[in-house]
């Protein structure tokens, strides 16, 4: 209400001799009189509030849609992010996820099925927001990706399997040995701070998209907050 009132006040000032005066420089009596006129107008024309709120919502949706579109273009071509296939694919899914997100884990089998059925690129953007342990596994996995891109997906599959997955040092060492990744190389990459910087950038990108939880998906330019009930929903979006 105050936002609408302020906009009307500014509009009235701009069609009056006071247009060139600063908003805060008008006299108290003049300001009070103008506000009284606005109050009376709004009270007798309540539809103006509805129209103003609808316009505000429409403008915010347009801004968000543009942000999603730009994010899709940028992330599809960002080789610092784990991805399956390239931006030449007809369809794409960008997933903002957390290794400790149960709903994200539910999506993994659906993604695997979609990759077999569609010309599809999948980009994984790790945003560790659920618990402190998520940050450790996210940064470590990013370091693995920087060292050995193929090996990363073995780590990804491990962490995205349903159930709790430890990310303590002993477990990570064991995984590196099992997946033929040199642990010392991963440690050296961690010391470079590049993995930390990538995860920090991902979190900043999620903030720009107003992401408040995982999973958050961008599918062929359209955003989707939350998981699918079943594969048919994902398939329908890719066939659209």
For every predicted segment, state its role.
Residues 1-21:
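Classical Sec-dependent N-terminal signal peptides that target proteins to the secretory pathway
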Residues 6, 30-31, 183:
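Short amphipathic alpha-helical segments that mediate assembly, nucleic-acid/protein binding
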Residues 9, 109, 113, 233-236:
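Alpha-helical scaffolding segments of alpha/beta enzyme cores, especially the outer helices
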Residues 19-132, 190-191, 195-213, 219, ...:
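Extracytoplasmic thiol/disulfide redox context detector
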Residues 129-240:
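Cysteine-centric redox/oxidoreductase cores and disulfide-bonded domains
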